[in-house]
Amino acid sequence: MMEGVRRAVAKFLRGGGVYEKAVDAFVKDLQRELIKADVNVKLVLNVTRRIKERALKEEPPPGVTRRDWMIKIVYEELVKLFGGDQEPQVDPPKTPWIVLLVGVQGSGKTTTAGKLAYYYVRRGYKVGLVSSDTHRPGAYEQLKRLAEEAGAMFYGEREGDPAEIARRGLEDLLSRGAEIVIVDTAGRHGHGEEARLLDEMKAIASKVRPDEVALVIDASIGQKAMGLAERFHKSTPIGSIIVTKMDGTARGGGALTAAAVTGARIKFIGTGETLGELEPFAPRRFVARILGMGDLESLLERIKSLEEAGELDRAAEDVLKGRITMRTIYRQLRAMRKLGPLGKVLQMLPGASMLASIDEGALKLGEEKMKRWMAIIESMTYEELDRPEIIDKRRMRRIAIGSGTSVDDVRELLVYYKNLKTMMKKLKRDKRLLRRLGMEL
C-alpha cells in the first residue's frame, strides 16, 4: 500500500494538465490502492469523496499550489481513516504493569511478546515474560529464547493449567523486581476452538488481573480484524491492539482501518522479523510515511537506541542537511543492521514519495553487499572519501583491486551515492513545502 500510494502522490505532484482531471485520476488511483490493501469499500468511497470535495472547493493560501494543498487534504483525511490524532501511551502509568497478550494462533503473539520485552528493556524497564501456552509445541522454548535475546526475565511451565501457570509466573517475576510483566497465552484455529480460547483467556485474566489486555492481530487478515476485535472485546475488554507482520502483506491498511473503526487503540505495529522492529502506531506519522512526507521522529528514535548513536547522529545530520560523502555512507553501513533495511529508513525521511523513481534494488542492501561496500570505502583515499565525484575508471580499478571486489561493485556504490544525493536535493524542497503548509512532522 505504501509504495502504491507514494507512486500516486509522486505522479500527481509531477503531472500537468487540468487540475480537476488530475484530481479525478489521483482519487481513482488512491481508491485502487486502498481497496488492494483490503480497506472496507464503504470507508474508501467515503474518504475519497471527502478528499475530492475539499480539493475542488478549498483555496490554498498564498505561496502554495493547488496540487500541494491537495496532498495536505489527503494527509488529513487519511489520518482520520487510520484513527485520528491518537498518540499511544507506551510508558505504563504505574509499575508494576501487567500486560496480557491474546489472539488467535498464528497471529505472532509469542514473537510480539519478545519484541515488547525488548522495547521496554531499551526504555530502561525491568521486564519479565511468562509463557502460559501449554498447547503449542515449542512455545515455551521460543519465549525463553526471546527473553534471553531481549534481556528480560522468564518464567514458564511446559505442562499444567495455563491460568495457574500465569499466576505463579506473575508472583515469581514480581518477587524478582519486574516492573512490566508480559503474559503470553495460547491461540486456537477455527470457530469452535476460538470459543475455548476466549474461556481460557477469561480464566487467565481473573488470575493475573492485567492492567492491559493487548489483542495481537495478523495484518494479513485485513478488514476481518474488525470482527475479531469485537469478539475478543465482548469476552474481556481489550485495552490495546498490536498489528503484526505489516511488512509481509498488502492488506495491512485493511487491518489498521478495521481495528480503528472498533474504537480500540492501536498501540504498536510490527514492521519486520527482528526484535527491534516494533514501533508505536501514530496515525499522523504512519500516513506521513505512506504519502512520502517522512517520519523523522521514528527515525530519530531508532537512531537513539543504537549503541553507535553518537556516530549515527553525525551521519543523520549530514543526510538531512544534504552533506553526503562516502564517510557518511560508511557510518550508515556500520549501523545498518540495527537501524533496519535502508529502504525502511529512507521511508522515514521527507521526500520519500520520490523514492518511486529510484531503483528499489539499490536500496535493499544484503549483508554481503554491505561488507563489499565497506571494503570499497576503506580502500579510498581521503580525497575520494570527501569528493566521490573525482573517481574515474582508473581510480575504480585501483579501488576494486585494493578492496578485493570488482569494478562493477565500485560503480554500483557510486550510483547509490548519486541517487542519495539526488533524493536529498528533493528533500530540501519538500521540507520547505511542509513548513508553508504548517505540516512540520
UniProtKB/Swiss-Prot annotation:
Q: Where in the cell is it found?
A: Cytoplasm
Protein name, UniProt field: Signal recognition particle 54 kDa protein
Originating species: Aeropyrum pernix (strain ATCC 700893 / DSM 11879 / JCM 9820 / NBRC 100138 / K1)
GO BP field:
SRP-dependent cotranslational protein targeting to membrane
What Enzyme Commission number does this protein have?
A: 3.6.5.4
Name the reaction it catalyses.
Answer: GTP + H2O = GDP + phosphate + H(+)
Q: Name one Pfam family in it.
A: SRP54
Q: What is its main location?
A: cytoplasm
List the CDD domains. SRP54_G
| Function comment | Involved in targeting and insertion of nascent membrane proteins into the cytoplasmic membrane. Binds to the hydrophobic signal sequence of the ribosome-nascent chain (RNC) as it emerges from the ribosomes. The SRP-RNC complex is then targeted to the cytoplasmic membrane where it interacts with the SRP receptor FtsY.
**What's the domain remark here?**
Composed of three domains: the N-terminal N domain, which is responsible for interactions with the ribosome, the central G domain, which binds GTP, and the C-terminal M domain, which binds the RNA and the signal sequence of the RNC.
Domain of life of the native organism: Archaea
- Give yes or no: UniProt keyword Transferase: no
Gene Ontology molecular-function annotations: 7S RNA binding; ATP hydrolysis activity; GTP binding; GTPase activity
Question: Which keywords belong to this entry?
Answer: Cytoplasm, GTP-binding, Hydrolase, Nucleotide-binding, Ribonucleoprotein, RNA-binding, Signal recognition particle
> Which HAMAP family does the record cross-reference, listed alphabetically?
SRP54
Member of which family? Belongs to the GTP-binding SRP family. SRP54 subfamily.
Question: Could you give the subunit structure recorded for this chain?
Answer: Part of the signal recognition particle protein translocation system, which is composed of SRP and FtsY. Archaeal SRP consists of a 7S RNA molecule of 300 nucleotides and two protein subunits: SRP54 and SRP19.
